[in-house]
Each structure stands twice: as C-alpha cells, then as structure tokens.
UniProtKB/Swiss-Prot annotation:
Membrane association type: Peripheral membrane protein
PROSITE patterns xref list: ATPASE_DELTA
Name of the protein in its database record: ATP synthase subunit delta
Family membership noted in the UniProt record: Belongs to the ATPase delta chain family.
Gene: atpH
Length: 182
C-alpha cells in the first residue's frame, strides 16, 4: 500500500488544494463519496476504465458523459487527468486518500458500525453520541454496515478501538471462558 499512497497522495493533495481555492471542499468530498460508491458498485465501469485496450480519448469521453452533470468542473478535470496519465485505474485509491486527508484536516473521526440489522434514525443518533464520547471527538462520521452473522447487537471500530456488543461476540467470549474453566 505504501507504493499506492506514493502514487495517489499527490493527486489527492493537489485536488484538495484546488477545491479549497474554489471553496468547494465539502461539495467535492460528497461527490468523491458518490463516485467512489459507483466505482466500487460497478466493476464493469472500473474494469473498462482500467483497461489498456480502451484508448485514452474514449475513456475521457466516457467520463465526460457519465460525470459532466454530476461533479464540479475541477472534479471532472481530475478524472480526465487521471485518464491522460494512465492512472484512472487507481481512481478509488485517489478518492479514498482525498476523503482521508479531508477527515484529517477537519479532525473528523471515522467509525465503522456493523450491526445485525438496520438501525433506525433514533438508534443511529444515540449510537453517534456514545461513539463520539468513546472516541473523544466532536466530529464523527459513521460508516454503517449490516452483518446478519452478528445475530444481534453491533460492533464499533474507531481507530484502534473495537467495541463488540454483538450476540456473536458474547457467544465467542462465553466459549473462550468455558474453554479456560474446563
């Protein structure tokens, strides 16, 4: 991953600086999240863009058609620049690094919450307050995931901290405790 960071960080940093100068940082970060979700959900798109068979001009035309009305002009320029430099295959890593730099700059902690079932808005708000207290931060971004294997409850990952309040985790800990006793 360090080699990939060596490639992606300059693009992410430069794009963040451009967005700051144009006062559109929050907007481009939201767009980056949307484009990243599309990129990850559509392997055909990412595969075609990474393909050496497809010519650069065709890639740029496709990017123009797909994203012209969806992203800022500076974001579209980043996409075309990555295509020009044969780096569009690492777009996901560039956008992830951009979002990471944005969070660092704004002191936003990232928490991944995996629950057994969908959480209501009320549960999410209560969980956000508790996780903010545990993470000791004013700003928190929560990434929600569903994993029915947890049976019930949830698991929270914030930085290096893990809070396992799942039924599966309790069963595992009970099994370990019983194994020690016998």
């Amino acid at each position: 991953m360090p080699l990939l960071n060596t490639i992606t960080t300059p693009y992410a940093e430069a794009f963040l600086q451009v967005a700051e100068s144009r006062k559109e940082v929050d907007q481009v970060v939201d767009q980056a999240k949307a484009v990243l979700a599309l990129w990850n959900d559509c392997p055909e798109l990412s595969g075609a863009m990474a393909s050496p068979v497809l010519e650069v001009e065709a890639k740029k035309a496709a990017l123009q058609k797909l994203f012209a009305n969806q992203v800022t002009p500076s974001f579209l320029n980043l996409l075309k620049l990555l295509a020009d430099r044969q780096r569009i295959g690492v777009l996901d890593a560039v956008l992830e690094r951009l979002i990471e730099l944005y969070r660092e700059q704004r002191n936003i902690a990232l928490a991944t919450v995996t629950s057994a079932a969908e959480l209501s808005e009320q549960q999410q708000a209560a969980l956000q307050k508790k996780v903010q207290a545990v993470a000791n931060t004013d700003k928190l971004e929560i990434n929600l995931k569903i994993d029915p294997d947890l049976i019930g409850g949830f698991v929270v990952n914030v930085g290096s901290k893990v809070i396992d309040a799942s039924v599966a985790g309790q069963v595992r800990r009970l099994g370990l405790a019983l194994a020690k006793v016998s």
